[in-house]
Amino acid sequence: MKSDTLVTGLKKDKEIELTVTGRKSGKPLPRPVWFVLRETELLLLPVTGTNSQWYKNVLRNPHVKIRSSQQSFKGKLRAITERKQVDEVIELFKVKYGPSDIKKYYPNPNVAGSLQLN
């Protein structure tokens, strides 16, 4: 199953490429992002929260593409805005990347994103 292979590959990666569609240009905009996995759910944390350009683009068009070192996947990214759920994502990021890096690189983690991989 493709999602099993994707999840297995993602477990080895620290960074993926996220491609969103520009809300003004309509062009694909790839960028490297950190992520965490929760079973078959890929979770993202915009570096500057609601001010992140990729997050603003996703609000306009939630269809995204991710590319790992193993393969790529297209899906629909769901915005997570409820504080408790965002805090859960932040905690998962702290486990994977370390609390000091999350504090350093994520000054305003007030939203997150979820992409189902199955």
Task: Give, region by region, the residue ranges found by the protein language model.
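Short helix-to-loop capping/linker segments positioned immediately adjacent to catalytic or ligand/cofactor-binding
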Residues: 5, 20-25, 100-105
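A generic structural micro-feature
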Residues: 10, 25-27, 58, 107
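Short beta-strand segments
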Residues: 13-47, 64
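Covalent nucleotidyltransferase core used to form phosphodiester bonds in nucleic acids
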Residues: 6-8, 43-56
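Extreme N-terminal tail/first-helix region
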Residues: 1-17
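A broad, low-specificity signal for short, low-complexity segments enriched in glycine/proline
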Residues: 3-7, 26-28, 35-40, 73-80
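Short, structured beta-strand-loop surface elements
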Residues: 49-118
